[in-house]
Amino acid sequence: MSVGRIDTAALHLLRKHEDAEFVRRHPRSRELLERGRASMPGGVPMSWMTGLYEHATIFPVAGDGAYFEDVDGHCYLDMNQVDIAGFLGFAPAPVTEALSTQAARGSSFLLPPEDSIAVAENLAERVGLPFWQFTGAASNSNAEAIRLARVSTGRERVLMFEGKYHGDVEDVLGRNDGDGPNAEAPGRAAHAARGELTISFNDIAALEAALAGGDIACVLSEPM
């Protein structure tokens, strides 16, 4: 059986049609995006929200379990769940009740609450690692992990794999374009490239060669 070639021109036309239809069906989101551009770059509170999905930006209003609804009344089954950070789903009752109770008592004291000890003890029991430290974002976690690795090893370089994402940290915002390391984002300090190395995932020979140099402080492994 012969297999014909994919008509890429037809695919481009189909994508163009579907993109236009998507925009047409989301007039309220379009209005909010335009309104947002008057006070936020790109019309969104965090710059990465403009390119996270390959469709026009939508604005959610509510979520329940695995589903959420946008301002135009469309309901979605969310297979991403905040990059898996929201693994309990949207608005789980035990979480919302606990948050409401604590908010009424006060929050953000800049002092350690008793619950932090309970959480650390629970994590230690479940995972088997004795000590835990909490951060406000994954980027902060990676930044602190890199610093700890550099202190404990006396080395500087961070080894990563192509296709990775480790947050908005100077030390991990580079990529290997074949002609050496290049910045993934503008404005990164030039010296940051000296502290990183990016290789292909599953290339064991390249990994062994990189580690043999004796200058790798840590390996961050999250190919995407």
Role assignments for model-derived ranges:
Residues T57-D78:
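Active-site and channel-lining beta-strand-loop segments
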Residues G4, L11-A62:
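Active-site-adjacent loop/helix segments that line or gate small-molecule/cofactor pockets in enzymes
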Residues A118-S221:
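PLP-dependent aspartate aminotransferase-fold enzymes
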Residues H26-R30, E34, A62, G89, ...:
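Electropositive phosphate-/nucleotide-binding environments in soluble metabolic enzymes
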Residues P27-G36, E69-H74, A124-E125:
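Short, hydrophobic/aliphatic alpha-helical segments
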Residues K16, W48, L77-N80, A217-M224:
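Short beta-strands and strand-loop turn motifs
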Residues S2-G4, C75-R155:
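Glycine-rich loop-to-alpha-helix module at the N-terminal edge of alpha/beta enzyme cores
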